[in-house]
């Protein structure tokens, strides 16, 4: 019933029977596994390529994570590189700022005096002819180009009004006149301009008032003055020479208007003086009357 152990050991085979061993590579599938089709291979390659593309282009992986050991290790290095300012490095900067403030306080007092000295010296060096040329350049007429700026504010916009053509003719005639005294050949054009002004009193009321005042002053001066043996030679002042070069543009525009009004009054006075020379003086009538009474007696 019980078999001895020695008998069992003798009956058991010493070496187990082994089948033939087949060799294969890691990449090759085992013989018991089914071979995959080419479609599954393409799908796997596509998924791998998509994962790589998403990893390279997505912003999720581009952001630095909030919890990172690399960021904690880099912060001590950056803090060591930055150096805090010391007292020795601040002292030179404080000295430079104080010196700059002291220079800024002293310079404004010296600059106005230098500017005033330069302006005074420039005004003293300029001759009356240079002052006249400068005034002409800033006024309506430019002697260098020989052109008239009809849009100049000093003309008061009269060149573009209803009498603009008459004003342009009279003003250009006076500017380009070569007669002595200047403007004697432009009397008729100035009279035509004044007649045009009288046709539009609403527009040229101020100019008409100036002309009336100039005519009244000329009439009173002609009535009071006695005729002399030699006719007085008319002189035309050069008002543009009186313009100060240091005045601003507004002052020069106002002076240009005064010059224009003065020229008109002088032309009117010359015309009335030429007419008064042909008239018989009042003293001659008185002497003739006394002579006639004496002859009758």
Swiss-Prot record:
Bias (Low complexity): 116-125
Membrane topology: Single-pass type II membrane protein
Short motif Cx9C motif 1, span: 163-173
Keyword entries, A-Z: Disulfide bond, Membrane, Mitochondrion, Mitochondrion inner membrane, Oxidoreductase, Protein transport, Redox-active center, Signal-anchor, Transit peptide, Translocation, Transmembrane, Transmembrane helix, Transport
Compartments (UniProt record): Mitochondrion inner membrane
Mitochondrial intermembrane topological domain: 63-297
Required cofactor(s): Cu(2+); Zn(2+)
Stretch list, region Disordered: 70-137, 208-297
Record field: transmembrane: 45-62
InterPro entries: CHCH (IPR010625), CHCHD4 (IPR039289)
Major localization class: mitochondrion
Topological domains, Mitochondrial matrix: 26-44
Coiled coil: none
Entry text on domains: The CHCH domain contains a conserved twin Cys-X(9)-Cys motif which is required for import and stability of MIA40 in mitochondria.
Function per UniProt: Required for the import and folding of small cysteine-containing proteins (small Tim) in the mitochondrial intermembrane space (IMS). Forms a redox cycle with ERV1 that involves a disulfide relay system. Precursor proteins to be imported into the IMS are translocated in their reduced form into the mitochondria. The oxidized form of MIA40 forms a transient intermolecular disulfide bridge with the reduced precursor protein, resulting in oxidation of the precursor protein that now contains an intramolecular disulfide bond and is able to undergo folding in the IMS.
Name listed for the protein in its UniProt record: Mitochondrial intermembrane space import and assembly protein 40
Biological classification of the source: Eukaryota, Fungi, Dikarya, Ascomycota, Pezizomycotina
């Amino acid at each position: 019933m019980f078999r001895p152990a020695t008998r069992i050991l003798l009956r058991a085979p010493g070496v187990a029977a082994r089948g033939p061993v087949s060799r294969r590579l890691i990449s090759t599938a085992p013989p018991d596994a089914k071979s995959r089709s080419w479609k599954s291979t393409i799908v796997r390659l596509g998924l791998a390529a998509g994962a790589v593309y998403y990893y390279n282009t997505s912003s999720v992986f581009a952001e630095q994570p909030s919890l990172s050991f690399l960021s904690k290790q880099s912060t001590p290095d950056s803090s060591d590189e930055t150096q805090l300012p010391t007292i020795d490095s601040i002292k030179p900067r404080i000295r430079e700022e104080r010196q700059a403030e002291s220079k800024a306080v002293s310079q404004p007092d010296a600059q106005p005096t230098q500017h005033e000295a330069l302006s005074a010296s420039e005004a003293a060096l300029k001759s009356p002819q240079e002052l006249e040329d400068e005034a002409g350049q800033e006024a309506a007429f430019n002697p260098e180009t020989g052109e008239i700026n009809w849009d100049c504010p000093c003309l008061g916009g009269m060149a573009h009004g209803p009498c603009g053509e008459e004003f342009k003719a009279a003003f250009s005639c006076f500017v380009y006149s070569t007669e002595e005294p200047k403007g004697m050949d432009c009397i008729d054009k100035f009279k035509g301009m004044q007649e045009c002004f009288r046709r539009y009193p609403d527009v040229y009321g101020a100019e008409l008032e100036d002309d009336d005042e100039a005519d009244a002053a000329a009439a009173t001066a002609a009535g009071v003055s006695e005729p002399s043996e030699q006719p007085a030679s008319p002189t035309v002042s050069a008002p543009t020479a009186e313009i100060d070069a240091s005045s601003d543009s507004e002052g020069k525009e106002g002076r240009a208007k005064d010059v224009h009004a003065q020229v008109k009054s002088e032309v009117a006075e010359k015309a009335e003086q030429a007419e008064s020379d042909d008239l018989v003086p009042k003293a001659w009538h008185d002497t003739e009357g006394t002579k006639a009474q004496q002859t009758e007696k």
